[in-house]
């Protein structure tokens, strides 16, 4: 998310200066990150060591996440995203809204179709490419076997989430590479299905360079079982105060941001894809139910 004042200044100097500094080189204010608050559905955290070594749990759930990602890649769904700015009276004073269908073209290639996208009324901030990247991919984070090599994963404990027994892990990127987005935060993994059911954190990096700030709020994503086997993202909420520093020609500004993303209408595409769950082929369900969304 870019400060609208900063955007105006940058447009004025764009012909004079080429921004070549890599996003990965921007300094990160780690102390500014406050995760989303947990509701009453999160029970007591058991900090005792698990019966199974954490490394084994991590290996198993990463493999299951890979299976989930493969399954998700063969589903169509609708994504409804809303980004709002909130004033000092806790009222919405600007909004960006878009409805997209994630579908397949006639050649079977995965693509996105904009269903509805009214003009943005955001005044104090402007949507950046990284905001769109987070909405399209980051908020539905999956920690697969391929991705886990890029993360430090630390076992925290065991906790129930709405009666689901979960292992809890803290995750953070080992190295931030140019043009890449990573999760920094915490995940809850179903102790039976070994799949992520809740993600709480933020996507990094933030760009903190003056006249080029690009900041992002913390978020939580909930998953639910959609096909009877895998846990699919159904709802994301992000909220926080973005602290934009002052610069040449503009003042410092704090902007209250609220994001919501809903994922609905999951449907399996085609008939040639095989659902593999725990190493076994599963017959596809006759009908895909719409997952109930967490409010």
Give the location of each predicted region:
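Structured extracytoplasmic
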Residues: 28-184, 191-198, 202-217, 225-233, ...
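Bacterial N-terminal signal peptides
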Residues: 12-22
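Detector for intrinsically disordered, low-structure N-terminal pre-sequences
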Residues: 6, 16-18, 56, 124
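Sec/Tat signal peptide C-region and signal peptidase I cleavage site
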Residues: 23-27
């Amino acid at each position: 998310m870019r400060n609208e004042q900063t955007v105006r200044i940058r447009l004025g100097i764009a012909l004079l200066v080429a921004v070549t500094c890599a996003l990965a080189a921007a300094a990160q204010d780690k102390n500014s990150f406050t995760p989303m608050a947990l509701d009453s559905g999160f029970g007591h955290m058991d900090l005792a060591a698990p019966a199974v070594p954490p490394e084994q749990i991590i290996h198993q759930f990463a493999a299951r996440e890979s299976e989930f990602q493969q399954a998700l890649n063969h589903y169509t769904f609708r994504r409804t995203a809303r980004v709002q700015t909130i004033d000092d009276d806790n009222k919405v004073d600007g909004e960006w809204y878009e409805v997209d269908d994630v579908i397949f073209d006639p050649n079977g290639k995965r693509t996105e179709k904009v269903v509805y996208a009214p003009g943005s009324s955001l005044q104090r901030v402007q949507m950046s490419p990284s905001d769109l990247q987070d909405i399209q991919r980051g908020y539905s984070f999956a920690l697969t076997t391929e991705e886990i090599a890029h993360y430090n994963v630390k076992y925290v404990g065991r906790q129930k989430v709405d009666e689901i027994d979960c292992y809890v892990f803290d995750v953070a990127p080992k190295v931030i590479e140019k043009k890449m987005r990573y999760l920094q935060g915490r995940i809850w993994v179903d102790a039976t299905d070994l799949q992520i059911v809740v993600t709480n954190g933020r996507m990094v990096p933030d760009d903190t360079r003056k006249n080029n700030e690009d900041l992002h709020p913390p978020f939580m994503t909930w998953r639910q079982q959609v096909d009877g086997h895998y846990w699919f993202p159904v709802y994301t909420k992000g909220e926080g105060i973005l602290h934009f520093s002052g610069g040449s020609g503009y003042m410092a500004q704090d902007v209250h941001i609220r994001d919501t993303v809903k994922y609905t209408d999951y449907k399996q595409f085609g008939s040639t894809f095989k659902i593999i769950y725990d190493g076994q082929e599963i017959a596809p369900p006759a009908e895909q139910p719409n997952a109930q969304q967490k409010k």
